Amino acid sequence: MMLSNLLPSPEPLGADEYGLCVASNLGLGQLFYRQVRQSPSSIAVVDDESSITYGQLHAWAVRLAAKLSQEGFVKEEAVGIVVQHGVADVVAQMAVIYAGGSCAPMDPTMRDQQIGQRLQRLNSRFILVDQSNRGRDLQFQQIVLEKHLPLTITDLCEENEFPVTTDLSHRTHLIHTSGTTSEPKAVQIAARSILQVVFHAPFEPLAVEDVVAHANNSSFDVSLFDIWAPLLRGARIAILKKMVLLDLVVLAEHIDRLGITVMATTTALLNLAASTLPTAFSKLRICFIGGEAANVSAIETVLRKGPPKMLINAYGPTECCIFCLAHRVTPKDIQMGSVSIGMPIGHTIAYIADESGCAANEGELWIGGAGVSPGYINEPEKNAKSFPTIMMPSGEAARFYRTGDIVRRRDDGQIDYVGRVDHQIKVRGFRIELEAIETSLLQTGLFAEVAAMGIQSPHQGAGSVLVAYATPKDPAHPPEISKALKILQDILPEYMIPQLQLIEKMPLNSHAKVDRKGLKQLFCQRSTSLLKPVPKLPNTLCQDTQTVLASLWATILATPKSEYKESDDFFVLGGTSLQASLLISQIRQVFRCEVSLLALYDNSTVGALASIIDHAKGGHLKTVRDEREVWLADTKLADDLPAPMTTPVNWQRDIEGRIFITGATGFVGAFLLSDLLHMPSVHQIGCLVRAPNSAAGMQRLRLALEKYNLWKDEFTNKLLAFPGLLEDKYLGLEQARFNELANWASVVFHLGARVNYTQPYSLHRPANTLGTINVVRFACTGRSKAVHYVSSISCFGPTGFFTGTASVGEDDSLLPHLEALPYDHGYAQSQWVADQLLRRLMDRGFPISIYRPGFITGHSQTGVCNPDDFFSRLMIACEQMKSYPMLPNQRKEFVPVDYVNSVILHIAASEHAVGRAYHIVPPNRDMSIDMDATMDLLGDAVNSRIHALPYMEWIDRLAANPPVALQPLQPMLAEKVHDANYPGGLKFPTLDCSLLKKYIAHLRSAC
């Protein structure tokens, strides 16, 4: 493979000096000895009690190196270092380097057995220990660090054999990092990798006057910066004990008293400072943070209340030695709502690869250059996978490290961290980025730190559970969990709402990162002790319904709650529509009765639902709700809106071009937003977004566009985010702001809607019916503006089956199709109401256009589609099941998203097009295909036979082993339908094989 689209680092400061140093090819020992010769009496290391000079450090290291060399010591021999954090750390490493060995620093808090196993795998013979560790049961030859001796002239002037001669390829360190198994991997660090960081930390070398905090555990690779960056530059190390780090007040005092100017610490410690003492790092010249994704809220607090001169967000896995990317944080990052991990430093090369290894704007980050490790010791298979050797554009071979981190490149070359490959989880068919949940929780302003995780419940039927632990921003007044979840529900889709657990303080592991493993264990321990077991069928006969139902709730919600009150509500306790679907399936299996999703939504308390189950035993409840009178009444809710007295603004005039759009974070909305942003006549676009503030709203918009590979950094010049709610009379805005924006806007595109195929009309009504009225009210306020409303042909319901209608005209009345509507889902019912409501307004002269697309699928050129819509889920499920339900004469109108938006924008460009409805469907009937033909194409696309089954037989097979993709919708598919024939909600678009192959390829990549 040959790489292109590489991201090289900019020309660093001090490049000439670095080049000369590399050209000399001297190892770390000789480079340090240069500093000793230049300034032997300069302070090298200082702590609370004492200090040692460069000359004294040299003398001490020489004596220890001599002891090592008496036993047939060989170059790059691994030497264990088990000492307390402090001066001994520095001396021990220097001694091993002087002897030509490889340092293997161990955390002294580890058990003897763990240390022994690690060093045995490295074939170590020697360990260096201090006085406090000399009595440990470690079966190696121990060399004890004695107190250093006074410096003599002889130590510097005589021809010593130490430091031994090494070069930049010398393996100086072996740093252990956790692996996917219980055995940690030993990462080899070469001298050239350390030198790369020393001279580019991150943008220029340290100054002689700098004092660098040694705050990191020496078994952690960032400690190499603490020690070697100052020593190779003639600067000073200041020791900070762990107990100092745990008390921010004491830490700030030490920074001041020791004159510390540079410190590398973890994001978790900065987060702690933000909530306890934001000024803790204010005396620093440079503060590096890293190890975890940057917390924008915490950074904003520190920048506002007590920033260091430079705050650097640094990135670098151990395999790339300390830092390989870096970014100086500024207030602009806070405004954008995200902090970049920066650009490559020094001679680092960054490459972003898709799953096939090809260059991409978003994908896995590969790192090349001087900092890359020689590999894991004694791990040839892992090295082959993690450190590929590939051809550079110059024709030279180069080694890269595959980080496993998903990143995104901005147009200006900055790189954004998206998440871990292994932090991307799936819950009931949905792909979820845990970082997105953490970011949203932090943006509520209620929490200081958040850790989200997916936990596989050991209890039958519960599946994966989303859990988030959070520390309150104001510990004295912790927020109500229900309040936080309510905010989240306005920001995130239902399947991303976690079970929220408050915790006083985040536990940290030995590397000062959030201990996610410990949090998972904590949750599982609580759940196991409190959850009721799922009842077996025979036992339900002798238990009351409410008790059995409570057991199901506890299992499905994985809620650590031992008892449920009769008034407890399934959805208030955190139940989502996906979990509601699972609950209905469990009820049918356990109680052997038919209960519909509608019954659950109408009776969501444990007491009410238990009564419904008792009533349903021996039969089934009605699954069709006839609310025709309600729907008709709702179509008249906007009749009191005053009709506009003037013609609408021409939104494409030079002095106009200001768009107000809803639903821009949805699939169709994201593509339409992208098209509008590319139009020269469009100057600004204001998007109504469910979010707590503008920054969070902008982040949602960006994530939506990035999800479909549409985002460009220049969009920020045109894009505005207005946090709000469709269901609110003034769209969630202050009335004055509502009026201001109404006069600002030139036109309105309304795509916002609640879409859930399993929920009733009553839950769709606020956003879809009332929201549409509120959008029209906005358009009528101030100057008159056209409303372009994107509906769907689903607004007609299954009219052909019930009314015999063969075709529907664009301007035909919707009233004749009301008879079929009770047999469709709540979303379609809300579409009918909103559509009919707007038709009544159009008859009164309101400037409104209605667009009714057929079934919208992916982009016809790129194949990018929505993996979460019904059609995509059904395709994947049918492929997995190798079967599909027979639905004779089921024809659907397939239209690609790019075609739909082209039609909308073409019509909307005409001033004379308002006042009508438009069907966006294939030009002729020959271009729509039925279910059988669609599945034949699916079989061709995946090169596999897909068999037809009678509908109920297919449902039984689905119930026995439901594919993950269809689990959320299984109860809807299984409900009784009119004449047991029409399976409401199944929609199949027209396809050809080549286009379907594009869609399947995209869906597979999204799974």
From Swiss-Prot:
Segments forming domain Carrier: 540-617
Family membership noted in the UniProt record: Belongs to the NRP synthetase family.
Function field: Non-canonical nonribosomal peptide synthetase; part of the lnb gene cluster that mediates the biosynthesis of diastereomeric piperazines. Lna and lnb clusters encode sets of enzymes that produce overlapping sets of previously undescribed metabolites such as piperazinomycin-like metabolites or morpholine. The lna and lnb biosynthetic pathways appear to be part of a signaling network that controls the formation of sclerotia, a resilient overwintering structure. One primary function of the non-canonical nonribosomal peptide synthetases lnaA and lnbA consists in the reduction of L-tyrosine.
GO molecular function, one term: ligase activity
Recorded domain comment: NRP synthetases are composed of discrete domains (adenylation (A), thiolation (T) or peptidyl carrier protein (PCP) and condensation (C) domains) which when grouped together are referred to as a single module. Each module is responsible for the recognition (via the A domain) and incorporation of a single amino acid into the growing peptide product. Thus, an NRP synthetase is generally composed of one or more modules and can terminate in a thioesterase domain (TE) that releases the newly synthesized peptide from the enzyme.
Short-chain dehydrogenase/reductase (R) domain, as annotated region: 659-998
Pfam family, one: AMP-binding
Name under which the protein is recorded: Aldehyde reductase lnbA
